[in-house]
Amino acid sequence: MSRISTHVLDTTLGEPAAGVVVQLEYAGPSGHWRVLGAQPTDGDGRCANLLPQDAMLEPTLEPGQYRLRFETESYHATQSVMGLYPIVEITVTVRHGDAHLHVPLLLSPNGYTTYRGS
């Protein structure tokens, strides 16, 4: 089963960022982006699999570029904070044979960090 997951942590509060809406987009060989789906992070700040149900059944991810779009402005508003980045977009390249991609986001009102997780 293939999957793309994320974990959003609020580094200012030192806790998971629950309720951040994450949209997943895909661009294959044509280069045109299409939305695959969107969901909010759970109480632990996680989206266990952003892929649509039919794509989860594949053993590996479709090669190409994937973009995770985090709606951070609405999250910061729930914390009564004005953030600098209303949206955080992270674009990654998936190569042939990758089955799982985990993209954590460490978030604060005035900055963010990401890395390839496991």
Where are the language model's segments positioned?
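Beta-strand-dominated extracellular/periplasmic modules and repeats
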Residues: 2-91, 95, 102-104
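Compositionally biased low-complexity segments at domain edges in trafficked proteins
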Residues: 98-118
